[in-house]
UniProtKB/Swiss-Prot annotation:
Chief location of this protein within or outside the cell: mitochondrion
Keywords: Membrane, Mitochondrion, Mitochondrion inner membrane, Transmembrane, Transmembrane helix
Subcellular locations according to the entry: Mitochondrion inner membrane
Source species of the chain: Danio rerio
Record-annotated membrane-spanning stretches: 28-48, 78-98
Function: Scaffold protein that participates in the c-ring assembly of mitochondrial ATP synthase (F(1)F(0) ATP synthase or complex V) by facilitating the membrane insertion and oligomer formation of the subunit c/ATP5MC3. Participates in the incorporation of the c-ring into vestigial complexes. Additionally influences the incorporation of subunits MT-ATP6, MT-ATP8, ATP5MJ, and ATP5MK in the ATP synthase.
The name this protein goes by in its record: Transmembrane protein 242
Membrane topology: Multi-pass membrane protein
Amino acid sequence: MSVEQASASGAVSDIVEDDKSHLIKGGAFLATVATAGMIAGFGATLAVAKKKSPDWFNKGIIGSAAVPESGASLALRALGWGSLYAWCGVGLLSLTIWKAMGVHSLQEFRQKMQSIFPAIPKNEDAQANSVPFDWNSIFKSK
């Protein structure tokens, strides 16, 4: 093996390492942003509920003799189970599609999806020639 081939194979392995590192960092970033969004949305919802009716909000925090479980703990339990069902459902759906298509890597999946669905035009000329969408036609009364 010559020096040029050795340096070329070293450069290729460096590129692969950089791609893996970039993919991991991107996944961590997306997970962080999604988690922050969920926490912010849940917190904002609680803040609005407390602002609208503080008496009812405080009654829901503490359990009573009539209702042994507080509304807040019931809501948190429902949020937990709903999140679990959503994660498992999306994972199962993704796995089913993956296996049904018979692909073995993300590259194969991408190629298969590109062969099934039409390409999305990236240039502005194609968008300029298309008919603009009219929202008023949808909401117009008959």
